[in-house]
């Protein structure tokens, strides 16, 4: 399964985009411009997250994803804050998010998305079913 994120609009610290699965648009995305992931291909897995106490959609290498969570790193300028794994998760706005996460939902206005939980749950189930069937899930981020 290929999840494609096409970034379509950048203004200030807001980066908006469209999320497609196998070419079909599923929802909108929202990222913090200063901490968003670089364009490219990433492996996607489901890992039990210590921060959220449930399985989450983790982007990138997950071998020791939660072993050092949270780890202090310089993530925004010279500010030390807990750096959690980059993941796809529900949320309404990116202000204050400096962990490279991608929020999913329906675009409402600049920098805000609505109905994040239904969009996340739908995406989570599709990824879970593909991983259970032994298929590889890849995230492709494009500018």
What are the language-model segments listed below?
Residues 1-137, 143:
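Cell wall/extracellular polymer interaction/catalysis modules
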């Amino acid at each position: 399964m290929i999840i494609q994120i096409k970034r379509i609009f950048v203004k200030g610290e807001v980066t908006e985009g469209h999320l497609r699965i196998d070419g079909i648009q599923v929802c909108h995305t929202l990222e913090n411009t200063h901490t968003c992931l670089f364009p490219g291909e990433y492996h996607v897995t489901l890992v039990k997250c210590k921060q959220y106490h449930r399985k989450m959609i983790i982007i990138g290498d997950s071998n020791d994803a939660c072993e050092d969570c949270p780890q202090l790193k310089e993530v925004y300028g010279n500010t030390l804050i807990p750096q959690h794994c980059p993941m796809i998760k529900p949320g309404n706005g990116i202000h204050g998010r400096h962990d490279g996460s991608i929020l999913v939902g329906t675009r409402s206005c600049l920098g805000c998305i609505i109905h994040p939980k239904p969009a996340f749950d739908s995406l989570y189930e599709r990824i879970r079913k593909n991983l259970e069937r032994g298929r590889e899930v890849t995230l492709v981020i494009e500018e």
